[in-house]
Curated annotation (Swiss-Prot):
<dbReference type="GO" id="GO:0006508">
    <property type="term" value="P:proteolysis"/>
</dbReference>
<protein>
    <recommendedName>
        <fullName>UPF0758 protein BCE33L4198</fullName>
    </recommendedName>
</protein>
<dbReference type="InterPro" id="IPR025657">
    <property type="entry name" value="RadC_JAB"/>
</dbReference>
<keyword id="KW-0645">Protease</keyword>
<feature type="binding site">
    <location>
        <position position="174"/>
    </location>
    <ligand>
        <name>Zn(2+)</name>
    </ligand>
</feature>
<feature type="domain" description="MPN">
    <location>
        <begin position="103"/>
        <end position="225"/>
    </location>
</feature>
<keyword id="KW-0378">Hydrolase</keyword>
<dbReference type="InterPro" id="IPR010994">
    <property type="entry name" value="RuvA_2-like"/>
</dbReference>
<feature type="binding site">
    <location>
        <position position="187"/>
    </location>
    <ligand>
        <name>Zn(2+)</name>
    </ligand>
</feature>
<dbReference type="InterPro" id="IPR020891">
    <property type="entry name" value="UPF0758_CS"/>
</dbReference>
<dbReference type="GO" id="GO:0008237">
    <property type="term" value="F:metallopeptidase activity"/>
</dbReference>
<dbReference type="Pfam" id="PF04002">
    <property type="entry name" value="RadC"/>
</dbReference>
<keyword id="KW-0482">Metalloprotease</keyword>
<dbReference type="InterPro" id="IPR001405">
    <property type="entry name" value="UPF0758"/>
</dbReference>
<feature type="short sequence motif" description="JAMM motif">
    <location>
        <begin position="174"/>
        <end position="187"/>
    </location>
</feature>
<feature type="binding site">
    <location>
        <position position="176"/>
    </location>
    <ligand>
        <name>Zn(2+)</name>
    </ligand>
</feature>
<dbReference type="Pfam" id="PF20582">
    <property type="entry name" value="UPF0758_N"/>
</dbReference>
Length: 225
């Protein structure tokens, strides 16, 4: 089996990582360090290349399932599990930066808080951030996964968590898998319904942010709130 030790010395990614730091490694080299070994037919770097090619780079690889990974020749359950665990740790580390009572002062703060987690999602996720009186995030909840419409996103589910957490206000977010954050008619209808319910029960819906690919739209800034 071809492992990292079998690669030509100047191409050994683990040794380069130790000498030059992880930031000096390419995507294929970092992947090789995680995989550790290749197969009888190919080196670990060639296996890395094959995986990256199969998923068209990191964008699709980050959401790869166990079944998709093991379908690649040379990747077994153990290697696939290592990769999936590494990707999940990466996502959690990104979130850690913002979990210490992150304060939201404007739509940009809100988009920055959720952008990296939501912009690559393959389905629409409707998420609520629950804030205290200082506009600090005290909880977040995924309310619904799927195409957004006013009959599915029920105010009861949104405000139930607000009462549980004694939240002072709410910010709603959802992503557009197309990457285009332009609001649809349904997006606007859902927003207006939630805002009206919030007014009645005394928990303000501050904004509804639509996440695209490194772009976002604030429905408050657009005048829909």
């Amino acid at each position: 089996m071809n492992g990292i030790r079998d690669v030509v010395k100047e191409e050994q990614p683990r040794e380069r990582l130790l000498l030059e730091g992880a930031g000096s490694l390419s995507n294929r080299e970092l992947l090789a360090v995680l995989l550790r070994t290749g197969s009888k037919e190919e080196s670990v770097l060639k296996l890395s290349d094959k995986i990256l090619h199969h998923f068209d780079g990191l964008r699709m690889l980050k959401d790869a399932t166990l079944e998709e990974l093991v379908s690649i020749h040379g990747v077994g359950v153990a290697k696939a599990s290592q990769l999936i665990a590494a990707f999940e740790l990466g996502r959690r580390m990104v979130r850690l930066e913002y979990q210490n009572r992150y304060s939201i002062r404007n739509p940009e703060d809100c988009a920055r808080y959720m952008m990296e987690e939501m912009r690559f999602l393959q389905q629409e996720h409707f998420v609520c951030l629950y804030l205290n009186t200082k506009n600090q995030v005290i909880h977040r909840q995924t309310i619904f996964i799927g195409s957004l419409n006013s009959s599915i996103v029920h105010p009861r589910e949104v405000f139930k968590e607000a009462f549980r957490r004694a939240a002072a206000s709410i910010i709603c977010l959802h992503n557009h898998p197309s990457g285009d954050p332009a609001p649809s008619r349904e997006d606007i209808e859902v927003t207006k319904r939630l805002v009206e319910c919030g007014r009645i029960i005394g928990i303000e819906v501050l904004d509804h942010i639509i996440i695209g690919d490194h772009k976002f739209v604030s429905l408050k800034e657009k005048g829909h709130i």
